[in-house]
């Protein structure tokens, strides 16, 4: 998610809360004098829902930013070495798919520095991986 998308989302939430807070809500009266019952939603009732929506959007943005810095090939290789494949595919960033699957109010913890992308270049699916461990370590995949 980009910064412009987050700004638009916050602006939309603010406009919605203003409209709900100050919008005129009157019972509809027909020509016979009987009014229908209208369910009035007050701003106090929607504050929690608005806070949850903004928190979910912030969680998705944080998760996307952290996942962009991950080396998916190294994560997948590590999973196979541990005997538990992580099923991460080297298709590229999966941040939109991951953000859509986030449970409410969840945040991704900091990704281990070992699995971040190399500063020396390298794309998804390269044969040589340089891990950011502070030491000069390269793993060659045959």
From Swiss-Prot:
The keyword Lipid metabolism does not apply. One of its GO terms (biological process) is chorion-containing eggshell formation. Residues 1-21 form the signal peptide. It is found in: Secreted. Its main location: secreted. Keywords: Secreted, Signal. One of its GO terms (cellular component) is extracellular region. The keyword Membrane does not apply. InterPro entries: Chorion_S16. Chorion membrane (egg shell) protein; plays a role in protecting the egg from the environment. Belongs to the chorion protein S16 family. This is Chorion protein S16. It comes from Drosophila grimshawi (Hawaiian fruit fly).
